């Protein structure tokens, strides 16, 4: 396991804990311990709980939908409105009830919308009849000026961790600095998120974490200690 990946995970934990602390919110989603099982396939509720535990109400999380063009158009429209209002809009996409991918919609400093899509297998956006393709087409129809970026970053090497990668990718893309919303920055970020077991343990840890207040964050040590603790558990588990 590279030290770079470890550092990326620690930075992600610290940054999202700071968001939680500053907002002063309590995110009490029930913990599903199965998400740490490498063979467990995430449900929509798991993905939403992981994202909400890290980002709270600072983002819009779209519901997972069946392959229904009208519903997809409605969610795409709602997501664009949220993004234009300043909230990162995150869309978990369930492809034929067999694979999760994700769409993150952000507003750049110049006010233009950029749409990131990634499939953790590294495959491209699907055709017009696929759910991913329908989302992208709906976004383009609603907002023709939107910049669509198909990241195609290959991360996943098993058959069960697409939900874990989708949740972590969406969290990472939501946290990408507004001054650095470029395809290159997004690809570089996701390229460091590659170990399914570590990601699952990180996500379970974030769901179980104690509430950390803004004052504790400012005092300095608690966020770092928690990030290190999660990281140590993850790497100890991988070594065994």
What residue ranges belong to the model's regions?
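Active-site-adjacent structural segments surrounding the nucleophilic cysteine of cysteine proteases
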Residues: 22-38, 143-160, 175, 202, ...
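Cysteine protease catalytic domains with a Cys-His-Asp triad
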Residues: 27-102, 107-116
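Cysteine protease-like catalytic core of ubiquitin/ubiquitin-like
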Residues: 80-180
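Contiguous terminal or domain-adjacent regions
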Residues: 169-240
């Amino acid at each position: 396991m590279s030290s770079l990946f470890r550092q990326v995970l620690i930075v992600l934990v610290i940054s999202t804990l700071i968001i939680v602390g500053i907002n002063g919110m309590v995110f009490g989603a029930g913990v599903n311990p199965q998400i740490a099982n490498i063979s467990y396939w995430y449900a929509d509720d798991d993905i939403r709980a992981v994202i909400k535990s890290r980002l709270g109400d600072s983002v819009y999380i779209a519901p997972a939908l069946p392959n229904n063009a009208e519903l997809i158009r409605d969610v795409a429209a709602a997501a664009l409105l949220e993004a234009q209002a300043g909230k990162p809009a995150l869309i978990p996409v369930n492809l034929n009830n067999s694979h999760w991918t994700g769409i993150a919609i952000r507003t750049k400093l110049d006010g233009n919308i950029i749409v990131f899509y990634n499939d953790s297998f590294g495959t491209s956006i699907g055709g017009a009849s696929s759910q991913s393709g329908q989302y992208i087409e709906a976004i383009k129809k609603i907002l023709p000026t939107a910049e669509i970026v198909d990241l195609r970053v290959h991360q996943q090497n098993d058959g069960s961790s697409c939900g874990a990668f989708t949740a972590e990718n969406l969290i990472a893309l939501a946290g990408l600095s507004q001054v650095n919303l470029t395809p290159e920055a997004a690809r570089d970020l996701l390229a460091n998120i590659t170990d399914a077991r570590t990601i699952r343990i990180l996500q379970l840890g974030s769901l179980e974490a104690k509430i950390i207040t803004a004052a504790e964050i400012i005092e300095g040590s608690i966020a770092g200690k928690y990030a290190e603790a999660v990281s140590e558990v993850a790497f100890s588990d991988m070594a065994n």
